[in-house]
């Protein structure tokens, strides 16, 4: 089937409009396809097949078959293949960034950065593949020798989001393949082309058929097949807490191992003794990166009373400079929101706050470019009764709360069911320790608005998820521990 392409790439084979199942590029068995649009222009970029239940089961069977040989490879052999994949990704960084911006909307500079960030996980876990270690235990019985070995958990599945369509895949696939597992990836329907391009490069790198597969389809039906299958031993999901709960329930009958990176409602606390310019810089990086569409975005900005007027003035000044537009254009710093539902949610949160007494300090409306573009917005006088305090906005809106002292700031920040990321700005050396330790969050940035990297463990507490990704701990979620007891009695 010949499919038209609206994206021009140096390596045109990276623009794949079929799913990768058992080493073959397949169309849907029932012919159903889904158009993928550019959120900046509304233009149709291409289409992808919606796989059937039967095709999902075929992918699971292929992953199970591929596991037999893949797990036998040494860590060094798996590392070499992962490193080859990483090199190809960076060799094709411009093409991948173009694909990513076209389907997701973020500025090209951010897209290039994401491709490099995505590659860092593959590089990191390629090295970790060679460092999977066991233990020798001191036995209480003299004639026995006790050992602990680690083995791949088996067939894994990943369900990934649209906001980081490259990095959220490699952060899961990297450790899975390094550990000796096989992986089925189900990317978001809004952004499948980046995932398919990564799979094409994995094939070029020599990763065997069935080891990495990418399927696109209805999230509910595909997700349920993956959860129901006893062959799939591990599921990794990045997305909303609501969907995470559903996947947990569906995985319970087969007692799967789960990694869940779920909703965030990140507090960003600025104390009176903070460096105002650094705090504003941190807010811009944390809140407005990717147009506010990240799980670790500053969703509630708490500013101490003494510094509040100065920070508001500086923040308004800097946010005015943000340039909204098509991410392919030079100088653009804010792309569109992903779809009309995202715009509607932003508008609802702003309207709710204003109806409860908040003040609009900047923006607050759709951008003159139309479509899903939204003006960067600042809302002051926000209180805990407003939706900003309870829900992720996932848009370019900075809601400002006031607080009087440290105890109040910590109490307000912890007043949520979520616990992914938090941020603290202060020059006080003691407070730099006491406040982060008191915050119920899995990650805390202190005098920085950017905390993500491949070296540190990424994940949350409470209803923000289970497990950690990245870091030396990330590979552990793809390994099973086995205890061996050897009796030497004659």
Regions flagged by a language model, labelled:
Residues 41-47, 232, 269, 323-327, ...:
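Conserved C-terminal structural/oligomerization subdomain of aldehyde/semialdehyde dehydrogenase
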Residues 1-40:
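Hydrophobic face of amphipathic alpha-helices that form TPR/SEL1-like repeat modules
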Residues 242-383, 446:
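ALDH superfamily catalytic-core signature
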Residues 39, 53-56, 75, 93, ...:
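Residues at or immediately preceding the N-termini of alpha-helices
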Residues 45-51, 66-72, 158, 268-271, ...:
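Short, well-ordered beta-strand elements within core beta-sheets of diverse protein domains
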Residues 42, 78, 100, 122, ...:
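Residue-level signal for inorganic ion chemistry
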Residues 43-132, 143:
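Glycine-rich loop-to-alpha-helix module at the N-terminal edge of alpha/beta enzyme cores
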Residues 134-278, 403:
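Rossmann-like NAD(P) dinucleotide-binding subdomain of oxidoreductase/dehydrogenase enzymes
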């Amino acid at each position: 089937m010949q499919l038209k392409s609206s994206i021009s790439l140096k390596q045109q084979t990276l623009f794949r409009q079929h799913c990768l199942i058992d080493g073959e590029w397949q169309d849907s068995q029932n012919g159903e396809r889904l158009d993928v649009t550019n959120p900046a222009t509304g233009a149709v970029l291409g289409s992808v097949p919606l796989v059937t239940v039967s095709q999902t089961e075929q992918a699971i069977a292929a992953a199970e078959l591929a596991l037999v040989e893949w797990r036998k490879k040494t860590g060094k052999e798996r590392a070499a293949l992962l490193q080859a994949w990483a090199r190809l990704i960076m060799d094709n960084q411009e093409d991948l960034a173009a694909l990513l911006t076209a389907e997701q909307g973020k500025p090209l500079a951010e897209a290039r950065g994401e491709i490099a960030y995505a590659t860092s996980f593959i590089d990191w876990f390629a090295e970790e593949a060679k460092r999977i270690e066991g233990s020798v235990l001191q036995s209480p019985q003299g004639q026995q020798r006790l050992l602990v070995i680690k083995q791949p958990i088996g067939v894994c599945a990943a369900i990934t989001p649209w906001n980081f369509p490259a990095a959220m895949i490699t952060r899961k696939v990297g450790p899975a393949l390094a550990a000796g597992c096989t992986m089925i990836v189900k990317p978001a329907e809004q952004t499948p082309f980046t995932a398919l391009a990564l799979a094409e490069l994995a094939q070029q790198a020599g990763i065997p058929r069935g080891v990495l597969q990418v399927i696109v389809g209805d999230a509910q039906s595909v997700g349920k097949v993956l959860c129901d299958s006893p062959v799939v031993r591990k599921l990794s999901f990045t997305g909303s807490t609501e969907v995470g709960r559903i996947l947990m329930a569906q995985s319970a009958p087969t007692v799967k191992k789960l990694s869940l990176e779920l909703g965030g409602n990140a507090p960003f606390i600025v104390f009176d003794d903070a460096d105002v310019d650094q705090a504003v810089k941190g807010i811009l990086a944390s809140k407005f990166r990717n147009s506010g569409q990240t799980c670790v975005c500053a969703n509630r900005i708490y500013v101490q009373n003494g510094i509040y007027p100065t920070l508001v003035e500086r923040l308004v000044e800097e946010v005015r400079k943000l340039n909204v537009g098509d991410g392919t254009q030079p100088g653009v710093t804010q792309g569109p929101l992903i779809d009309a539902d995202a715009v509607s949610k932003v508008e609802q949160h702003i309207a709710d706050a204003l109806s409860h007494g908040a003040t609009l300090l900047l923006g607050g409306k759709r951008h003159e470019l139309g479509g899903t573009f939204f003006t960067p917005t600042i809302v002051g006088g926000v209180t805990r009764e407003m939706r900003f305090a309870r829900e992720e906005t996932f848009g370019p809106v900075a809601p400002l709360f006031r607080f009087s002292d440290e105890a109040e700031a910590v109490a307000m920040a912890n007043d949520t069911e979520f616990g992914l990321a938090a941020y603290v700005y202060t020059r006080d050396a003691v407070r730099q320790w006491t406040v982060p330790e008191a915050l119920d969050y899995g990650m805390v940035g202190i005098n920085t608005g950017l905390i993500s990297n491949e070296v540190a463990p990424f994940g949350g507490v409470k209803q923000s998820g289970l497990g950690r990704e990245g870091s030396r701990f990330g590979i552990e979620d793809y390994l099973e521990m086995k205890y061996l007891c050897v009796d030497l009695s004659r």
